[in-house]
Curated annotation (Swiss-Prot):
Name the UniProt record assigns to this protein: tRNA endonuclease vms1
PROSITE patterns named in the record: ANK_REP_REGION, ANK_REPEAT, VLRF1
Location of the active site: 249
Function: Endonuclease that cleaves polypeptidyl-tRNAs downstream of the ribosome-associated quality control (RQC) pathway to release incompletely synthesized polypeptides for degradation. The RQC pathway disassembles aberrantly stalled translation complexes to recycle or degrade the constituent parts. Vms1 acts downstream disassembly of stalled ribosomes and specifically cleaves off the terminal 3'-CCA nucleotides universal to all tRNAs from polypeptidyl-tRNAs, releasing (1) ubiquitinated polypeptides from 60S ribosomal subunit for degradation by the ERAD pathway and (2) cleaved tRNAs for recycling.
Modified residues (Phosphoserine): 38
EC number of this enzyme: 3.1.-.-
GO terms classed as biological process: ERAD pathway
Coiled-coil region(s): 359-392, 506-550
Family: Belongs to the ANKZF1/VMS1 family.
Length: 600
């Protein structure tokens, strides 16, 4: 087995090729335990713990220690770790790339691996994680499907009668034309063809302002068959990602519109410059690309994919049969990463697992999946019951408060072990009145507010709009006064009155004096107004009587009146209030009646 690791998949020895037998059930269902996969050919006991798999991501193709370290530092692994903490199922790499489609540019950085834990990357993982919470639950049919059903590997068994545990050799389908069905004949045919004309590959990666490209030949290298002959290579880096916020400037512009700043302008310029630089690489490598047998591209996100497939005169078509994606986790777009990916693609994978262990472990996976499914369903049912119970609590509490039945309210809290600061549910319905104290304030019930405060209702609690009860009591002076009185009587240490935005403390006597003073002031103002109205009434009556006398004299004396005095009289009446005019009219009618009686 040690000899196999010294070759790549296109330079396997003839004696090894002769002993290979395609394992259909192995390659289709991918039942291998990758704890036993090794590029070095070390035989591992099938009972040992699976150290080459990742439980968080549910993969088991981590063949070496370096690959395991690399995977642990990858954004995909960190993302699934966050999901596991919150009891959510992991996502596949394709799902992860779909989630971060509009965010991914900032997930790629420099070649330094220490940068993978940078503040920008952490922010992006957090952003992608929050976005993933909007993804619906996986249906049961999908849960039953093993994510390795469409495995990128095809497995061959190495027939060896003397071996107690069978040996399997895996090759990536992506390295063959028509990669859906790889046979032994195709593997032998490809090896013969590779000797005559070495396989030529083009590899491209772009993301986060980083671009790496390489055209390599699988020409035999006697020193290391896993190292290609590099025909051309290019790396480019441009500042295009938004620090802290994350994502590309173009994605931000599409969402929020153009932002005018020095940094945004520079990023827009660099995005266009990066596209031009990549197009120039394609133009310079045009003839080499035509001779390539396979083209591997990693371009996550619509903006990155458009660089390869949507630009004028694009040399790569999305329907090109030579086009491939990398069938494993990749890191930042650097030349060393391209070399690592090449080595991963051409290195045969070796597994020492017996069929009994495979079936047992597969059954264990299915059993664990069923258990996890039951746990998720149970958790959902429990959450639904909890929501209904909270809604019922809210309904009863509001009913008691509305009736000002504080005793029934407190008894209900005690019997159901609820806090007096109980948060009403659902929160989106009770944004303004989130707690009993908020509700009592909106009901303008000062007595209820006073009782709630003295029973421990916290005035510093915020409602759904971020307001304290005191802040929403601005329309009722009596309710506001109860907060000031409570602050005085309960003391400064009873609640955080400053956080509650409650004003300076005042005693009930002070409040009553203020109310009495205000009441006296209003009463005095009312009396002053009545005195002024009475004075105006008397003056108006006097003027009317005098005018009536003059009118009578003129009516029975010389000449006839032109009615000017009547106009003046009407004007004077118009200046009075409606009540005063009515009183004057009644008195005028009474005076006229008396005069008629005297003349008879």
């Amino acid at each position: 087995m040690g000899d196999i690791s010294k070759h790549n998949i296109f330079s396997l020895p003839e004696d090894i090729l002769a002993k290979l037998e395609l394992r259909e059930e192995y390659s289709v269902e991918e039942k291998t335990d990758s704890a036993n996969l090794s590029n070095q050919g070390d035989i591992v006991d099938s009972t040992q713990k699976n150290i080459s798999s990742c439980v968080n991501c549910q993969i088991d193709n981590l063949h070496t220690l370096d690959e395991r370290k690399s995977h642990i530092k990858s954004d995909w692994h960190r993302f699934n770790t966050k999901r596991k903490i919150t009891k959510l199922p992991p996502v596949s790499q394709d799902e992860f790339e779909s989630i971060i489609e509009d965010l991914p540019e900032s997930l790629s950085g420099s070649e330094s691996e220490t940068n993978s834990e940078s503040e920008e990357d952490n922010f992006q993982i957090e952003k992608a994680f929050k976005q993933s919470l909007n993804i619906g639950k996986v249906d049961s049919a999908d849960e039953n499907n093993n994510q390795r059903t469409n495995s990128p590997l095809t497995w061959f068994q190495l027939s060896n009668a003397s071996a107690e545990v069978p040996t399997y050799i895996g090759v990536y389908k992506h390295m063959f034309s028509g990669n859906n069905h790889i046979t032994k004949d195709l593997l032998v045919q490809q090896q013969n063809h590779n000797r005559q004309k070495p396989l030529q590959l083009a590899m491209f990666m772009v993301g986060g302002g980083h671009f790496a490209a390489m055209i390599a030949s699988n020409e035999f290298n006697p020193r290391d068959p896993h190292v290609p002959k590099v025909l051309a290579q290019k790396t480019i880096h441009r500042y295009t990602t938004r620090r802290k916020q994350g994502g590309s400037q173009g994605a931000a512009d599409n969402t929020k519109g153009n932002i005018h700043s020095a940094g945004s302008g520079l990023r827009r310029y660099n995005e266009q410059a990066l596209i031009k630089d990549i197009q120039q690489v394609f133009k310079d490598w045009g003839k080499l690309l035509e001779t390539c047998d396979l083209i591997f591209v990693r371009a996550i996100g619509s903006s990155n994919r458009s660089i390869f497939f949507s630009q004028p005169g694009a040399l790569i078509s999305p329907k090109d049969p030579k086009l491939r994606v990398f069938p494993f986790t990749t890191k930042r777009a650097t030349h060393s990463e391209l070399l690592r990916c090449y080595k991963e693609l051409v290195t045969p994978k070796i597994s020492h697992v017996d069929s009994i262990s495979i079936k047992a472990q597969e059954e264990e996976r299915k059993r664990q999946a069923e258990i996890e499914k039951e746990i998720r369903q149970s958790r959902l049912q429990e959450e639904e019951r909890k929501k209904k119970k909270l809604a019922k609590y809210t309904e009863v509490i509001i009913s008691n408060l509305k009736a000002s039945n504080i005793e029934a309210f407190l008894e209900y809290l005690r019997s159901n072990d609820l806090s007096i600061n109980f948060q009403f549910y659902p929160k989106n319905v009770h944004l303004h009145t989130s707690t009993p104290l908020h509700y009592a304030v909106t009901q303008k019930n000062a007595k209820l507010v006073a009782k709630l405060l003295r029973n421990g209702a916290d005035p510093a609690m915020l409602n759904g709009n971020g307001k304290t009860p005191f802040e929403i009591s601005t329309g009722n002076k009596e309710v506001k006064d109860e907060f000031l009185i409570a602050r005085h009587e309960l003391g400064e240490s009873f609640f955080d009155w400053e956080a509650a935005k409650v004003g300076a403390p005042q005693s009930r006597e002070q409040i009553q004096k203020q109310r009495q003073k205000a009441k006296t002031k209003l009463e005095n103002q009312r009396r002053d107004k009545e005195r002024q109205e009475e004075l105006r009434r008397k003056e108006a009556m006097q003027k009317i009587e005098e005018q009536s006398k003059r009118d009578y004299d003129k009516l029975h004396g010389e000449g006839h009146s032109l009615g000017i005095n009547n106009v003046r009289k009407v004007d004077e009446l118009q200046s009075l209030s409606p009540e005063m005019r009515m009183r004057i009219e009644r008195e005028k009618r009474a005076a006229a009646a008396m005069k008629r009686m005297q003349t008879k």
